[in-house]
Amino acid sequence: MPNGRSHFLPESDPGESAKATRGAGVVRARASTPSKGDTRARIIEAAREAFSTMGFEGASLRSVAKEAGVQHQLATYYFKTKEELWMAVMDELAIGFFARLGERIRGLEGVDAPTKLRLVVREFVKYSAEYPQLHRLMTMEGRRESERLAWLIKRHVSRFYSISTKLIREAQATGVVRPGDPGQLHYCAIGIATSAFSLAPEYKLVTGNDPFARSHIEQIADLVCDFLFARPEKDHQRRNK
């Protein structure tokens, strides 16, 4: 990061040099002050942890501001209410996922449905490992009906459900994916994909394994695919008669 000081100050009178030094100090001070984007990002990052560990009721704007290292008044400048901050957190997590998902799907144009489903599953598992807070937050909000849950469903959840079940139905049509209600398969697959990450402290203490190890993430993705692509034995036998 530039420190604002010129490497070659002119050899002028002491007064001019002093002015230049004071000016450089001002520039350095400004350079060390976080930009608006950085400040907002720090607040959202702190809020993401707070909401995903303490829940909406347990977190507060004041505690989030303290964790982010900013004044409470500055936090309220960016987010007038706790609800507004919570929505910003959910938007950032969901929009980030949809951006990754969209890029992946666009890159799979012309690919067969089963392969597309497998690769999208792996993208979802990878994102869930990078941002375990997403499923923790979804689990907290999904426990009871509320305005926040209704907002989430309308704004993000329904969209993902539609994409996911469409991919499942298309892959089922080829005969290589487990038969059954796509909605049930969707939610069961999410459970397999996210549990080790969202319950990471418990999982690590019980199993002794690091859920965020690259090899483990790959294994989880394999498990989700094995679940979706496995067919009941009777169905398999019937199809091969």
Question: Model-derived features: where do they sit?
Answer:
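Amphipathic alpha-helical segments used for helix-helix packing
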Residues: 129-150, 200-207
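Hydrophobic alpha-helical connector segments
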Residues: 103-134, 182-189, 233-234
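Short acidic/histidine-centered micro-motifs embedded in hydrophobic/aromatic stretches
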Residues: 137-141, 155, 188, 192
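Short coil/turn segments at alpha/beta junctions that flank glycine-rich nucleotide-binding fingerprints
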Residues: 53-57, 131, 174
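Generic hydrophobic, amphipathic alpha-helix propensity
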Residues: 39-48, 64, 89-97, 101, ...
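C-terminal peripheral helix-coil segments that are non-catalytic and often amphipathic
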Residues: 1-27, 119-126, 130, 158-174, ...
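Helix-turn-helix
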Residues: 42, 50-84, 88
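Amphipathic, non-transmembrane alpha-helical scaffold segments
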Residues: 44, 90, 94, 117, ...
